[in-house]
């Protein structure tokens, strides 16, 4: 049985105009092979397998952009003309979203290498800082202060990242951070396959992150849930932080309401509909 890379097959069979576009569709979870979702572009599949592309065409280079887009809409964040950073940039979904919302410059920071989409690598507004650990970045590294930062990191807790980001922000700077329960809860609270399903653990994690944010001088200004789950099916949350202004009262009842709504909407499927 002859096999071929899935991204190559998508191009050969006319589902995508280029391998770059094919990769985006695959990483967005929009490609089914014999009705099974495949999200790795390099996966080899039988050439006679039935391919199907589902869902609307993504407006960003990866589905990550949908997460930030929801946060910006819910929180009313404005990026026009601002200098920003995408911390944990990966393919650059957040970076793309920022640019489409008028950001003047985006520092795409990631410890990985070769992940940033070519469209963004070749955009003069993007500073590609791959192979860079955010904890090693200083205002001197950038040569300027940030008006805005997004945080979407894996295998590290936000309590290690938020203090660093606070030092990089200009007066009045803002942050939208993705809270991932699987990387905030202790190992004993993470379930099979790295998924945290217990809403009570989600609430605890959010409260922990809020406490860290406040300790660093941030004013919590908004909280919502991500419209799409993480790769393994984890429900994630978006936290809006400001360095100035009045804080929103995020008591236990408020957090409980957000978590309950997230599970009601997202449990059993990967995205809002």
Language-model features and meaning:
Residues 92-93, 114:
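Glycine-rich SAM-binding Motif I of class I
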Residues 181-198:
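Short, glycine-/aromatic-enriched active-site segment of Class I SAM-dependent methyltransferases
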Residues 1-47, 83-84:
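A basic, amphipathic helix-loop patch mediating RNA/tRNA/ribosome contacts
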Residues 80-90:
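Conserved class I S-adenosyl-L-methionine
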Residues 97-105:
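Conserved S-adenosyl-L-methionine
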């Amino acid at each position: 049985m002859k096999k071929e890379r899935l991204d190559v097959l998508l191009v050969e069979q006319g589902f995508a105009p280029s391998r770059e576009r094919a990769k985006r569709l695959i990483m967005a979870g929009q490609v089914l092979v014999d009705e099974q979702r495949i999200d790795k572009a390099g996966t080899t599949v039988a050439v006679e397998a039935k391919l199907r592309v589902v869902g609307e065409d993504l407006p960003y280079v990866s589905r990550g952009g949908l997460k930030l887009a929801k946060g910006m809409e819910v929180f009313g964040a404005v990026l026009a003309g601002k200098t920003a950073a995408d911390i944990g940039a990966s393919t650059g979904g957040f970076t793309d979203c920022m640019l489409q919302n008028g950001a003047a410059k985006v520092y795409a920071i990631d410890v990985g290498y070769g992940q940033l989409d070519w469209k963004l690598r070749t955009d003069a507004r993007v500073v590609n800082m791959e192979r860079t650990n955010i904890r090693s970045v200083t205002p001197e590294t950038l040569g300027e202060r940030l008006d805005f930062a997004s945080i979407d990191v894996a295998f590290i807790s936000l309590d290690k990242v938020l203090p660093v980001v606070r030092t990089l922000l200009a007066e009045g700077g803002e942050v939208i951070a993705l809270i991932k329960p699987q990387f905030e809860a202790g190992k004993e609270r993470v379930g099979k396959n790295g998924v945290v399903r217990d809403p009570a653990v989600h609430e605890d994690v959010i409260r922990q992150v809020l406490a860290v944010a406040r300790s660093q001088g941030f004013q919590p200004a908004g909280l919502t849930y991500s419209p799409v789950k993480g790769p393994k099916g984890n429900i994630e949350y978006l936290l809006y932080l400001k360095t100035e202004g009045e804080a929103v009262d995020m008591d236990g009842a408020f957090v409980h309401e957000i978590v309950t709504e997230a599970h009601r909407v997202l449990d059993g499927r990967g995205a809002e509909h």
